[in-house]
Amino acid sequence: MECSPILVERIRAAIETGGGAVSLARYMELALYEPDLGYYERTPRIVGRRGDFATSVSVGSLFGELMAYWIEHEVGASEGLSDGPVEIVEAGAHDGRWAEDILEALMRGSGKDGERFCYRIVEPSATRQAWQRERLARFGDRVVWSEAMPARVRGVILSNELLDAFPVERWCWNATQRRWVEQGVYWKEEKFDWIALPTPAPLEWNLPEELQSVLPNGFVRERSPSAVAWWARAAAALHAGCLITLDYGLEAEEFLTPGRSAGTLRAYHRHRFFDDLLSFPGEVDLTAHVDFSAVAEVGLQAGLVPWYRERQSRFLMRILESTQRSPGRFPDWSTQRVRAFQTLTHPEHFGRGFWVLAQGRGGAPWGRA
């Protein structure tokens, strides 16, 4: 596996400009999102069986159909949205497949009522926006694009595996000094390597005395200020409805367990992960677990109320149970669709490690809080 020499030179230039090192977050920003060269910018064909990783969307259309039913029957009936148009705002849409599945399900299941739902994709990348426009062309003006989150949203802001794709900082515990030290990236002996940065540790990471004495030297923890900031902006934009993400992640205290001493950041290629995180910029996916505690906190600070905070399996089963009360409004269950649902909910697939975090302006009409 060879990486782009142009991308390597751009990262090296950033390191030189930064005084000899950059944060891991800056390295990831270039390796993943540099126009035409970054991992997420090169091709839409990185997801699925023939790509580097699978997602709930790549399992098939069922995931989008279930979300469409939930949007119509829960979000569309929530406080402030029971009448009038409902906007669906998706961020991190990649090639637009989830949007396609959701829109097709809404048009098929809602009939004329489906016209109250309009779809917006927030996409800052011109490359990815072109992929999405090609896939969604047949929906015409029912789909619109913007580079940034709109100032006011009445409906649902949703994402699937978006927050885990934000760049992260990497911090190591210095047991002798009893403090966190940020690790950055520099160029050494013709390769990228780790180096300590003189960055003050986050104040919220002050550890209790009993944990300071047992946390092993070199214990790694990541944080993603950009993911938390994105959630805060989305929460501020939500005027009525729900802000929801489906992703893999942990609560704050779970990051400090013995099994995660090397952190959660992984490099993926062809459904395998690599321990060497810095060797193949632009050729591998770099992803870390979401800190749901930090994300949820900024939503609450913005005035949102809890809707869901549960495993993806339970959330989808709840939607499935609701579809049984609406005969004829959901497609019949073929063998293929049953297998897809099992993949989405089984503990060995997407059921255990993936979680749903949803917060809203107003209570959840299905009685969840």
Enumerate the language-model features and the residues they cover.
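Rossmann-like AdoMet
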Residues: 1-153, 171, 314, 328, ...
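Short, well-ordered beta-to-alpha junction loops that form the rim of enzyme active sites
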Residues: 93, 162, 246-250
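Conserved acidic residues
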Residues: 154-155, 241
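A mobile, often basic/glycine-rich helix-loop segment
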Residues: 158-211, 258-268
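Generic recognition of stable, solvent-exposed alpha-helical segments in well-folded globular domains
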Residues: 6, 23-26, 58, 62, ...
